[in-house]
Amino acid sequence: MAKGQSLQDPFLNALRRERIPVSIYLVNGIKLQGQIESFDQFVILLKNTVSQMVYKHAISTVVPARAVNHHQHVPGAAGEEQGEAEA
């Protein structure tokens, strides 16, 4: 797994698990709102009245509606070695 995903995956997974509403801002300035239904290496499935597949390369910022507790012990955090993890 890429080092950049060692923060991304636990953060997105906490948003998904806790069904926290999010605002996703795209690089072109468009704001999308909903709940993260699922995600993988390349896309986020955002659910509102419909489900939208949003490509991660088009995302600028993900803003949760409330604070997120994503600080679980994750192998690879604080410079530890990390193996392949599930999303």
UniProtKB/Swiss-Prot annotation:
Residue spans crossing the bilayer: none
Q: Sm domain spans which residues?
A: 9-68
Q: Which InterPro entries match?
A: Hfq, LSM_dom_sf, Sm
Question: What GO biological process term is on the record, naming one?
Answer: regulation of RNA stability
| Record-linked PROSITE patterns | SM
Cited Pfam families = Hfq
What GO molecular function terms would the record report? RNA binding
Q: Which N-terminal residues, if any, form the signal peptide?
A: none
Q: Which domain of life is it from?
A: Bacteria
Key words, A-Z: RNA-binding, Stress response
Q: Which GO terms describe its cellular component?
A: cytosol
Subunit and partners: Homohexamer.
Job description of the protein = RNA chaperone that binds small regulatory RNA (sRNAs) and mRNAs to facilitate mRNA translational regulation in response to envelope stress, environmental stress and changes in metabolite concentrations. Also binds with high specificity to tRNAs.
Spell out the family assignment given in the record's similarity comment. Belongs to the Hfq family.
> This chain belongs to which protein, by name?
RNA-binding protein Hfq
Q: Which organism is it from?
A: Aeromonas salmonicida (strain A449)
The organism that produces this protein has a lineage beginning with: Bacteria, Pseudomonadati, Pseudomonadota, Gammaproteobacteria, Aeromonadales
